[in-house]
């Protein structure tokens, strides 16, 4: 199985099966996905971090695809789009609560709907929903697992400290 390294996850193992691809990382929950989803995620992750992929990562991508995948169109309500847009305004290394997002979009009573919209975010690396936390500061849920959410926030703070 191909191995490569991501900045904050360490060594990653890629398991390739007929109907799914799965990234295995120590102490991190990563869901199985299609080849296109995996490649889109890795490429958008590269853009999101503004850090070039390592030679190992590029080698894996070269094995998987000869061309950069296209993002598929996503249908979403205006409400969800407004939540996702608001998430993109949360600065690197900072967090905002679901309540703050609801207020930002002008619908302060829509906490549950905001949470649903955050959870439905199909662009995890582009719309940084890992920056959304509970009002009491606890991390809350994350599509790729709470360990990865904590790692992303810690990594962002370290990046800021280096600037």
Regions found by a protein language model. Name each.
Residues 1-108, 159-163:
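Basic nucleic-acid-binding alpha-helical/helix-turn surface characteristic of O6-alkylguanine DNA
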Residues 82-86, 113, 151:
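Pre-recognition alpha-helix immediately N-terminal to the DNA-recognition helix
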Residues 87, 101, 129-130, 152:
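Residue-level signal for inorganic ion chemistry
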Residues 91, 122-128:
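Short, proline-centered helix/strand-breaking motifs
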Residues 109-124:
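Regulatory, non-catalytic segments
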Residues 135-163:
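…primarily DNA-binding HTH/wHTH and HhH modules…
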């Amino acid at each position: 199985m191909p191995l490569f390294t991501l900045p904050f996850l360490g060594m990653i193992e890629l398991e390739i099966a007929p109907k799914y691809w799965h990234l295995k990382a120590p102490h991190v929950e990563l869901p199985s996905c299609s080849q296109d989803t995996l490649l889109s995620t890795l490429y958008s992750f590269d853009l999101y971090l503004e850090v070039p992929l390592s030679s190992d990562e590029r080698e894996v991508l070269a094995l998987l695809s000869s061309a950069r995948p296209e993002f598929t169109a996503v249908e979403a309500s205006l409400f969800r789009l407004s939540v996702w847009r608001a998430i993109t305004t949360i600065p690197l290394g900072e967090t905002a609560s679901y309540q703050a997002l609801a207020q930002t979009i002008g619908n302060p009573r829509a906490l549950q709907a905001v949470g649903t919209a955050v959870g439905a975010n199909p662009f995890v690396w582009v719309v940084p929903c890992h920056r959304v936390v509970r009002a009491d500061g606890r991390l809350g849920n994350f599509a790729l697992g709470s360990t990865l959410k904590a790692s992303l926030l810690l990594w962002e703070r370290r990046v800021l400290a280096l600037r």
